[in-house]
């Protein structure tokens, strides 16, 4: 009997590994044509020529400068078209073009913006992505606003400021404060990659707040300190308390992929502040098992992932990460999940080869009772089946009585 629920797939090397041609033709082209992960807001007419170029030049390493550079002219051309549309008063067209430019930048800096390389070309692409995206969303009826939150609870190697996005529905004000969904982003998806989620959240009359997780993008929390996210959320929640149009007594968090780890942690450490938490495709313990880490680069994630994970957790080498991360960061090993928690919904595909489904199942053996929905035959995140369940659960939880603030 195999040790891992993933079964034979645990030892399988997926055919797209090391081949951008196979990745594009077998996985990404279809996702791009549907504008789904990781191509949200994108258009295949922008991407097909780029991937044809990369394939013709045999560029297969997404970590290379050549990979990123291949996307930049297309993104710049879209920004120029957007400027012309804006000058002509065509605001909706300009916004759509800028969103398309932003997602081209997003794929160019995929899969990870190395926080230890502030001058890298991927960082440049990320900065351009944010600029294009905020221009695009400023043209929406209900725009997304960037706010720089003071990290009032910071210690040690934490940075001083926390950039977040906030989007509120029409009618939100001091006399009508609205519930909050705080999105915790992932390893490769950052603040500017969540348009559709904010649309869905606002359509239900809630505010969307989007924040990045330690070791990624612009997050100032010390990636090497397992307790840094606790201070991060303390500062974010303290700021949100000061916004009169936001009802912080009716708040849930939604952690996506790597963000799911932080949703699980917050469900325990900040249980008195939250009505609930969704951990969507989360790791908590087994994803850091050396046996799992020895095989994860072979699985469904588009590129190698362990180097990014190592940097994200504050390690200088993959070897140090593999040797020490589970003992240091596991929410089981450190006893976090033995504490009481707020309501916690766990969602994933049973065939997840990025973080094992065991990381959801083990939580039912610890702490407060949990809720879960797992999808046989589906990979990481359990898409598309898991999304309707997410919104149904949020609707139920945010209709519950408010939390009493301390």
From Swiss-Prot:
| UniProtKB keywords | Endosome, Hydrolase
Q: Which SUPFAM superfamilies has this protein been placed in?
A: alpha/beta-Hydrolases
Catalytic residue positions: 257, 352, 380
EC number(s): the record gives 3.7.1.-
Which InterPro entries does the record match to this protein? AB_hydrolase_fold, FrsA-like, FrsA_esterase
Where mainly located?
Answer: other
Q: Does the keyword Hydrolase apply?
A: yes
EC class of the enzyme, as a word: hydrolase
* Pathway(s) per entry: Pigment biosynthesis; melanin biosynthesis
Look up the record and report any one GO term of the cellular component aspect.
endosome
What changes when the gene is disrupted? Leads to a yellow-green color of conidia. Impairs the accumulation of 1,3,6,8-tetrahydroxynaphthalene (1,3,6,8-THN). Results in an altered conidial surface with masked surface rodlet layer, leaky cell wall allowing the deposition of proteins on the cell surface and exposing the otherwise-masked cell wall polysaccharides at the surface. Decreases the protection against the host's immune defenses. Causes enhanced insect mortality compared to the parent strain in a wax moth Galleria mellonella infection model, probably through exacerbated immune response of the wax moth.
Q: What are the subcellular locations of this protein?
A: Endosome
Tell me which Gene Ontology terms the entry assigns under biological process. Answer: melanin biosynthetic process; pigment biosynthetic process; polyketide catabolic process
Q: How is its activity regulated?
A: Serine protease inhibitors strongly inhibit activity. Moreover, 3,4-dichloroisocoumarinshows and 2-acetyl-1,3,6,8-tetrahydroxynaphthalene act also as a strong inhibitor.
- GO molecular function annotation: hydrolase activity
Q: How does it assemble?
A: Homodimer.
Regarding protein family, the annotation reads: Belongs to the AB hydrolase superfamily.
Q: What does the UniProt record say this protein does?
A: Heptaketide hydrolyase; part of the gene cluster that mediates the biosynthesis of dihydroxynaphthalene (DHN)-melanin, a bluish-green pigment and a structural component of the conidial wall. The first step of the pathway is the production of the heptaketide naphtopyrone YWA1 by the polyketide synthase alb1 though condensation of acetyl-CoA with malonyl-CoA. The naphtopyrone YWA1 is then converted to the pentaketide 1,3,6,8-tetrahydroxynaphthalene (1,3,6,8-THN) by the heptaketide hydrolyase ayp1 though chain-length shortening.
Q: What is this protein called?
A: Heptaketide hydrolyase ayg1
What is this protein's gene name?
ayg1
């Amino acid at each position: 009997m195999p040790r891992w629920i993933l079964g034979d797939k645990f030892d399988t090397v997926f055919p797209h590994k090391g081949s951008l041609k196979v990745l594009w033709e077998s996985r990404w082209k279809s996702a791009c044509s549907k504008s789904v992960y990781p191509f949200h807001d994108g258009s295949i007419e922008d991407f097909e020529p780029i991937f044809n170029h990369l394939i013709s030049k045999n560029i297969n390493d997404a970590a290379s400068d050549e990979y990123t550079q291949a996307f930049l002219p297309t993104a710049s051309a879209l920004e120029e078209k957007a400027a012309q549309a804006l000058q002509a008063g065509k605001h909706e067209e300009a916004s759509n073009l800028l969103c398309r430019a932003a997602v081209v930048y997003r794929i160019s800096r995929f899969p990870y913006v190395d926080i230890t390389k502030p001058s890298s070309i991927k960082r440049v692409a990320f900065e351009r992505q944010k600029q294009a995206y905020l221009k695009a969303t400023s043209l929406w009826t209900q725009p997304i606003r960037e706010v720089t939150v003071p990290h009032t609870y910071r210690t040690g190697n934490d940075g001083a400021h926390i950039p977040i996005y906030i989007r509120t529905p029409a009618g939100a004000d001091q006399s009508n404060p609205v519930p909050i969904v705080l999105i915790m982003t992932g390893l490769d998806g950052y603040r500017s990659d969540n348009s559709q989620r904010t649309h869905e959240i606002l359509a239900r009359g809630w505010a969307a707040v989007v924040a990045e997780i330690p070791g990624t993008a612009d997050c100032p929390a010390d990636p090497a300190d397992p307790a840094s996210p606790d201070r991060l959320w303390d500062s974010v929640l303290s700021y949100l308390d000061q916004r009169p149009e936001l009802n912080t007594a009716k708040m849930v968090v939604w952690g996506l992929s790597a963000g799911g780890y932080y949703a699980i942690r917050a469900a325990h450490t900040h249980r008195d502040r939250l009505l609930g938490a969704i951990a969507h495709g989360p790791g908590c313990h087994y994803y850091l098992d050396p046996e799992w880490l020895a095989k994860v680069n072979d699985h469904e994630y588009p590129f190698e992932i362990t180097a990014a994970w190592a940097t994200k957790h504050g390690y200088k080498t993959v070897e140090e990460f593999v040797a020490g991360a589970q003992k240091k960061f596991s929410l089981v090993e450190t006893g976090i999940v033995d504490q009481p928690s707020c309501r916690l919904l766990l969602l994933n595909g049973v065939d997840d080869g990025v973080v094992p489904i065991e990381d959801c199942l083990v939580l039912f053996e610890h702490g407060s009772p949990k809720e879960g929905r797992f999808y046989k035959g589906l990979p990481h995140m359990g898409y598309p089946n898991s999304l309707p369940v997410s919104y149904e659960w949020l609707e139920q939880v945010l209709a519950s009585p408010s939390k009493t603030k301390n």
